[in-house]
Amino acid sequence: MNSIRQIERLNEQELDKPFSSSWHQDYSDSAYIYIGNLDFDLNEDDILCVFSEFGEPVDINLVRDKETGKSKGFAFLKYEDQRSTVLAVDNMTNVKLLDRLVRVDHVASYKVPQKEKEPANLVPLGESGSSLSVSTINTSNLPDHDYKTIIQNEVEQTLSPKDEKDLLDPMRDYIHREKRRKLKHESSDRSDKSDSNRHSRHHRRHSRSRRHRDLDG
């Protein structure tokens, strides 16, 4: 119980902090998060139970295989308060759920491909009496590892096959950040190695110079 209260206090403090200079600010216009590497046995209710700790979910989309209906291991969830996405990303990334380390990240834009004129399904929220709008994503053309799709200003719209080709990759920004971080790290390593080599060459020149002076003397 004490640990739960401590988490709640930390979450409240985090929400009260200004994050204009934080990387989270880049996603201040989107209340959606991407949740990846989910166990295939988890369903919408399981995900809501875990992520409702950080705010009130108002939309969830657990992507399923079109033919089998089985989970493909990733989902998109929208919070009522955009600031809840910051808490979810900071607190749930690399947290183990059923022996899997889940990946959680912001989603910059999200288009929802639907079959033409197909109504959205509704998933009950249990005892709350309200419901979540769940859009059906057409996954027939997407491999399991391909995370194409996602929202654009929280709209549910019908997309033609041509439109689906223009879907944004929800992991694009995350991948770019990781690449920049890796390149920066490699650049730092090369710089340190270069400094070390220069120091070594200087030391060898200095040693040779001393030996020459000793011989001359």
Swiss-Prot record:
The modification Phosphoserine is found at residue 160. InterPro entries: Nucleotide-bd_a/b_plait_sf, RBD_domain_sf, RNA_proc/Spliceosome_comp, RRM_dom, RRM_Ist3-like. GO terms for biological process: mRNA cis splicing, via spliceosome; mRNA splicing, via spliceosome; U2-type prespliceosome assembly. The keyword Zinc-finger does not apply. Residues 199-217 have a biased composition (Basic residues). GO terms for cellular component: nucleus; precatalytic spliceosome; U2 snRNP. PROSITE patterns: RRM. One of its GO terms (molecular function) is RNA binding. Residues 128-138 have a biased composition (Polar residues). It is found in: Nucleus. Required for pre-mRNA splicing and spliceosome assembly. Belongs to the 40S cdc5-associated complex (or cwf complex), a spliceosome sub-complex reminiscent of a late-stage spliceosome composed of the U2, U5 and U6 snRNAs and at least brr2, cdc5, cwf2/prp3, cwf3/syf1, cwf4/syf3, cwf5/ecm2, spp42/cwf6, cwf7/spf27, cwf8, cwf9, cwf10, cwf11, cwf12, prp45/cwf13, cwf14, cwf15, cwf16, cwf17, cwf18, cwf19, cwf20, cwf21, cwf22, cwf23, cwf24, cwf25, cwf26, cyp7/cwf27, cwf28, cwf29/ist3, lea1, msl1, prp5/cwf1, prp10, prp12/sap130, prp17, prp22, sap61, sap62, sap114, sap145, slu7, smb1, smd1, smd3, smf1, smg1 and syf2. This is U2 snRNP component ist3.
